[in-house]
Every structure is written in structure tokens, then in C-alpha cells.
Amino acid sequence: MFKSARADSFQFHDVDTVTRPKLGDQELAQTSVITLAHYDQHADSFWRGTRDHDVSQNRNALLNSLAGPGPFRILDFGCGPGRDLKVFRDLGHEAIGLDGAERFVGLARAYSGCEVWCQDFLKLDLPTEYFDGVFANASLFHVPSQELPRVLRELWATLKPGGVLFSSNPRGENQEGWSGERYGCYYDLARWRELATRAGFVELGHYYRPPGLPRDQQPWLASLWRK
């Protein structure tokens, strides 16, 4: 029987499903159930700890890659408590949030004043060719590797022609598994590039964060992809 991860456990496996069996239906569902329960339980402390994080580099990267003068319709995919959602709205864009954690959805609606959809990343229901940009900041790494190709195709489909996906994820050596009560996948650039291009995206560029530090002190891989 599948067991939830302990808060002090670290269990990682290679993401190559050719050599590693896929997760069963129950195991797959639990990657969301347990991860979302963690965020719901710690929503307030998460908000206090991330509210002042400066990710303006990431927001600007997306906005500067969009064609036309705007305003743009932007999906904040994994919006959390709504920090970036509010910034996009304050800049005059039509920003819509999406998160699977109910506490985050409530916080984001209250803080940003934006429409926020409560959707599990594994059970998305997105409109076709609706958004100019998708801002996936620190969110897609929670999608198990066997489901990520499908989720990336769904994000491709919800973008208008020429739309742009921004993603930023903690990078690694192509492994996935439990870190405490959160499930995550940690890719290098080559593997992430392969996944995104197979979903139909064209790479616009990438960079590592935080800026101005040696590469071994830059744990985040950010990249931009055009439909």
C-alpha cells in the first residue's frame, strides 16, 4: 500500500520511466493529495515566508516576451497566495490565478482581487487558446514526470497562437520523489528542453537564479517558450 512521505524523508528516483515503473493510480493521486494538504496546512507560514521574495526578473521575462502593447491575459499557474497575481493586475493586465490548494485560492482571491480557479494540476480544465501568457513560477516541478508531457500539452493548448509559457523550477539531475510531504521533479536544462519541445513549444531563452551568483549557488532554472 502507498504510504505518505514523512516530513523528514527524502526519496528520489530517476525520472526515466523506461527504467522506473510508472506510479499506479493511487500513488499518482497521492502525489497531489499529500502535497496539497501540506500547502493547505502551512498556507499562512508559506505566505509570510514568500510574500517579499523578489521574482520581478521572472515576471519581466514573461511580459517582455509577449507580442504587442498589451494589456495581456495571463494565467498564473500555481499562483499560491497571489503575490505575482496582484502585480500583474496592478500593471493593468487581466490576471487569472490557478492553484490546487484551497487555502491558497482563498488567500489569492482576497489579496489580489483577481479571479482564481481551484484546479488540481493533474485534473486541469483549461479553455482553448485563451491566454497570452502562462506564468508557471515554482509550480510545474510538482507534476510527476509521467504526467508532465500531458500537462505541458494542456498549457500549450490554452495559449493563443504565439503565446508564451514561462517556467521556473528547482533544477537537479533528473530525479523525482518525496521531499518531506511534497512531491517534486528536478530536471536539468537538457531534459526540460526535451519535454517542452515535445509538447510543441519553441525555446526563447533560459537563465539561472538568483542572478549574479556562481552557477552552483543558482538552484533555479527559468525558461521561456513560445507556442
Model segments located where?
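A short acidic, Gly/Pro-enriched loop at the edge of an enzyme's catalytic core
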Residues: 122-134
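Class I SAM-dependent methyltransferase SAM/SAH-binding core
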Residues: 81-123
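A short glycine-rich, Lys/Arg-flanked "PGG" loop and its adjoining helix->strand segment in the class I
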Residues: 149-161
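Acceptor-substrate binding/catalytic loop of class I
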Residues: 175-191
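Conserved class I S-adenosyl-L-methionine
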Residues: 10, 16-80
